[in-house]
Amino acid sequence: MTQNLSQPPAVNAPESELDLVRYLDVLVANRWLIAGIAAVVMLLGATYAFLARPVYEADVLVQVEDNPNSAKSLLGDVSSLFDVKTDANAEIEILRSRMVVGKAVDNLHLYITAKPHYFPLIGAWVASRAKQLSEPGLFGLGGYTWGTELIDVDGFDVPEALEGQPFKLTALGNGRYRLENKSLDTPIEGVVGEPLEAKQSVGTIQLLVNTLAAKAGAAFELQRDSRLKTLEMLQDKLKISEKGKQSGIIGASLEGKNPALTAAIMNQIATEYVAQNIKRKAEEAERSLVFLDGLLPQLKLQLERAEMKYNEMRNLRGTFDLSEEGKAFLQESVTTETSLQELKQKRAELLTRFTASHPGVQAIDQQIAVMSGKVGAMTRRLKSLPNIEQDTVRLMRDVQVDNDLYVSLLNDMQQLKLVKAGKVGNVRLVDGAAVPEEPVKPKKLTVTALAGVLGVVLGVVAAFVRNTLFGGITEPQDIEEHTGLSVYATVPLSDVQIDLSSQLTTHKRGQYLLARRVPDDPSIESLRSLRTALQFAMQDSGNNLVVLTGPTPGVGKSFVSANLAAVIATGGKRVLLVDADMRKGYLHQYFGKDRKPGLLDLLAGDRSIEQVVHREVVPGLDFIATGLFPHNPSELLLNPRMVELMDTFRAQYDLVLIDTPPVLAVTDTAILAARAGTVLMVTRFERSTLGEIRETIKQLQHANVEVRGVVFNALDPNTYRYGYGSRYGRYRYVQYGYTSKPSAEAEAESA
């Protein structure tokens, strides 16, 4: 029978809505898990935010100028002979270079780490709030510092093999200390302010402690790192960028836990950057001076020769006045030739610093080519003048060009000397680094808030992972869709039954049957619908034996068996309920009966049926308990005596209901189910999984047993308040009638 007789057809919501509400169901069902994870992660984040050592940031601002302003009025165009404009990216790389950063590493001994030995997590936080020296250690042990302890190490050299290894320095009092390391032959003792040199098998140790403010027993952490490694780490930590596109303003910043040291590092870097720029400009000016100083005698000799040739011509031919055309040509020729010679001088000077492929040299080459073309054109024009005027113009031009070059060269040399002596570069320090007062990290509120968000995300992930790996079935339709079995009844979770179950564990004798205590409870109403479905299912079953089982323990199989038997009995049927779970069965407690005698005694032949059956535990319902738990229940159930008993029960009762152990736990159920006409499987909301249900069906099929239907037990509509309502038309289980009270008969029986 494939029709579900326990529920009317449902109006299905769109599939997209069902997916959404299922997700909401998972979140609602795991809300406490999500809240717990979020609270823990948020607490960890807040702990970190308030206990972590604060991080400070120091920054500097430098300006890169095209030419130094202080020299423009003095130098004029001479700067173009040696000043090559650099872009911001090049200056950024210079600022980050080993040449600049290395000076800060050396001057501040950044490769030496010396700090108090703090207790993990909270030690530094406690010390930051102390006002005086502390008593070292934790309960006198460990040498931990908790106060204003201070150490200043001016020099610390170790063999290369010990670089990066931690040393422990312990204050001994009276200005003395002890240095320890696992690689040292013996601990080394020294005096504050005095250089220490100790020869060990690994090499020589040199140490100079300038300051040691601590009580005897206080420990400090000391470490000497590689200079190159320290330099590279500092380069990586530097943040350098141009402030605005092509602004020429470069900002550099550094983060560190010691505000004073961080500011000192940035000031050292900025100072060295400016100093190297000035030094580079002075060196360039010096090279230009050397070049021009070698060129000056040649120009002087060239000028003297030109003047001598001009004078010889005048003495030979006398004074000759140029025409207006000749005068104009002479002036233009002098200007052009002078420019050409200056360009050639500039090219020669640039070649002392750069190769011929440098962009500056190539630009000069292009200008020389243009100017040479002009000179060639003027030379051709000169031939159109009379011969005597040609000679006069040529000689006068040579004199004026050589004179202009000579005078210009003298001026350039004087200006270059001013550049060299003036110590002026094309970069200047706009803002030095000030000691930061407020930390930039951690931002307490931000970290705490982000930790809370991360906690919620992790909680949601954990909820879905838990639901995927361990989550049970939450909707009866999933069972039908994935197994093909009909869900005969959906039994809601009963608050009254929860109370009864807690009373059941006290082993106090009484009747704890929900069908008797609250006969109109919604759970019992659903079992009545199961009774109807079972009646139709048994029409072609072959016999009146019904086996109830489940995939795993804890699905509520015994609750369903006991109350279903009572419900069927109240319908006028003679019913026998047999507790065949001879490993953990406890149905006798529902009726306030003893475990023995029971089924074990019948199988062993020690008792008769009349001696074992508890008559009329509920009107129309007889009951057989398990008896004492045997050590071989499977073998007993295989006994032919069991077959005889089942045949006898079938003949004496309208319906025989057998409660069996979980299928996935033991094999007992398959033995009994093979003789039954109807087998029902009890599953539990949020506990039974599809994998367990499929495996149960598979194992029973191996024993030639067919599961007729499923009972979906302990549905809690309040847990999945979205999906269940959407799938089933937003109805809830309610009692139809007046407020339920335990029946007087049930109260009397329990008493």
Curated annotation (Swiss-Prot):
GO terms for molecular function: ATP binding; protein tyrosine kinase activity. Its EC number is 2.7.10.-. Its main location: membrane. The keyword Membrane applies. Residues 1-31, 466-751 are cytoplasmic. It is an enzyme of class 2 (transferase). GO terms for biological process: polysaccharide biosynthetic process. It catalyses: L-tyrosyl-[protein] + ATP = O-phospho-L-tyrosyl-[protein] + ADP + H(+). The keyword Nucleotide-binding applies. It is a multi-pass membrane protein. One of its GO terms (cellular component) is plasma membrane. The chain crosses the membrane at residues 32-52, 445-465. It is found in: Cell inner membrane. Keywords: ATP-binding, Cell inner membrane, Cell membrane, Exopolysaccharide synthesis, Kinase, Membrane, Nucleotide-binding, Plasmid, Transferase, Transmembrane, Transmembrane helix, Tyrosine-protein kinase, Virulence. Residues 53-444 are periplasmic. It holds the Pfam family GNVR. Probably involved in polymerization and/or export of exopolysaccharide EPS I which functions as a virulence factor. May be involved in an ATP-dependent process in the pathway for EPS I production, possibly export of the trimeric repeat units across the inner membrane or their polymerization. Belongs to the etk/wzc family. PANTHER family: TYROSINE-PROTEIN KINASE, TYROSINE-PROTEIN KINASE ETK-RELATED. This is Putative tyrosine-protein kinase EpsB. It comes from Ralstonia nicotianae (strain ATCC BAA-1114 / GMI1000). The lineage of its organism: Bacteria, Pseudomonadati, Pseudomonadota, Betaproteobacteria, Burkholderiales. The gene is epsB.
